[in-house]
A protein has these predicted regions:
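Short, basic amphipathic alpha-helical segments that act as recognition/interaction helices
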Residues: 28-50
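Short acidic/polar alpha-helix capping motifs at helix-coil junctions
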Residues: 6-7, 18-19, 60-62
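Small-side-chain structural scaffolding
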Residues: 8, 23, 31-33, 37, ...
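Short Lys/Arg-rich basic patches
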Residues: 1-11, 65-69
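Surface-exposed, Lys/Arg-rich phosphate-binding patches that contact polyanionic backbones
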Residues: 13-32
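Aromatic-enriched hydrophobic runs in primary sequence
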Residues: 22-24, 40, 44, 58
Length: 70
């Protein structure tokens, strides 16, 4: 991973609460959650730049929606 750097992150109460919940639910540190989110975002962005489409699917209701990064 290389040399680590420190940064200050300003989040709203709602965003901080979401981060806390994700960390707790997944038994991860907040830093690990943010790192994972960055990796996921980069993966999605790279695939979309190649012209690929990302979908979420609800098999129970036979519904599918395209994920868009805005």
């Amino acid at each position: 991973m290389g040399q680590k750097r420190t940064m200050t992150l300003n989040l709203s109460e709602e965003e901080m609460s979401s981060l806390d919940q994700l960390a707790l639910r997944n038994d991860m540190s907040k830093t690990a959650v943010i790192r994972k989110a960055i990796r996921i975002y980069l993966t999605l962005e790279k695939r979309m730049q190649k012209g690929e489409h990302i979908f979420v699917e609800d098999e129970l209701h036979q519904a599918r929606a395209e994920l868009l990064l805005v």
